[in-house]
Amino acid sequence: MSRSAASSVGSITGESPQKKLLQSASSSSSLAILHDEIAVSCFARVPRCYYPAISLVCRNFRRLMASPEIYIERSVIRRTENILYVAIRSEATKTLSWYTLNLKPFGTTEISHRLVPVPSFPSIPGYGTTIISSGSETYVIGGCIDGELVSTVSVIDCRSHTCRFLPNMKEPRKCAAVGLIDGKLYVVGGCNAPSLSWVEVFNFKKRTWESVLSLDNVDMDEQMNFFVMNDKIYRIGQNTMFVYDPKKGRFEEDLALGRLWFNESCPIDNVLYGFYCMNQILAYDLVVGMGTVFWGLEGLPEGLQSCTGRMVNHGGRLAILFKKSPTEIWRTEIAIERAEEGGYISGKFLWSNHVLTLTDSFIIERALAVTV
């Protein structure tokens, strides 16, 4: 349109050409926002395994797939998924790499699962770090860098793989027992004893660490594992198990569990599961105080053992990731069956399949379930 024609249009409508151009640009911007809102609403209903393929369609789709809005929408419409994150350390280079267990796009069976790398995952100290998950977030506590213990605490948002830091702990730590209980972050042990802050707690509202308990008159051996159940932190040593109850503010020794659990275990609905013997799993009901051995689950693969396997609660199922050979990782899932509360516990083998092959020997350091 020529300048004279635009002036004629402006004189007829009573509006300047510049104003009409601004209104047109504003309409286009509003339309783009509306299109984004519609796209986010649609994509939020699509399983995450298709997101990499959708991201390849165009730059705008790639931007939307990485936006926090799509995960907010997934939460609102209750389409979140329970995703497994696995930390794998190379025995040759000692580097830590992160993977997620995803379905192959257009896969139709359980064997379509695979571990895919997460190159954007923030770096984590090389040794002794405690890693836990809650909702869509992963907490990274302490560790050892260049032979020195650190007191740093970071929080990774697994929706965007971005990281923020909490204030440093009072004590540097490695291999600490950690639990999120009643909206507070408790950290137990892992520091040089004796310490006035052997147990400390982070108050998210005040954003401060407080010393809770010193280590007095308690003979604790080296920590091998820990878990949180019934708002208590269970610390597993080589020969002992101590339970820290934040409400009572003290430790109590659990003699029964101390004889059973030392390396790898996983709590699901007040029941603790762990490796018992080669290719056997023991379920221990903490409420009833009784254990059940899953003898010879049909289809259970050879090679399950605590020194190479990691257990995790995967949406109420028991997922086990383990080394089947020096370079292969397999995943097994077991459905937990129980007639009623306090009743007999049994396990049903669902499937086992190969999910990753690496070129070098490795250690499965950690397995976490994250909701996104």
From Swiss-Prot:
SUPFAM superfamilies to which the protein is assigned, alphabetical: Kelch motif
Keywords attached to this entry: Kelch repeat, Repeat
Kelch repeat locations: 137-183, 184-229, 232-280
Gene3D superfamilies recorded: Kelch-type beta propeller
Entry-linked InterPro entries: F-box/kelch-repeat_ARATH, F-box_dom, Kelch-typ_b-propeller, Kelch_1
Repeat among keywords: yes
Matches recorded under CDD domains: F-box_AtAFR-like
Residue span(s) of domain F-box: 34-74
Protein name: F-box/kelch-repeat protein At4g14905
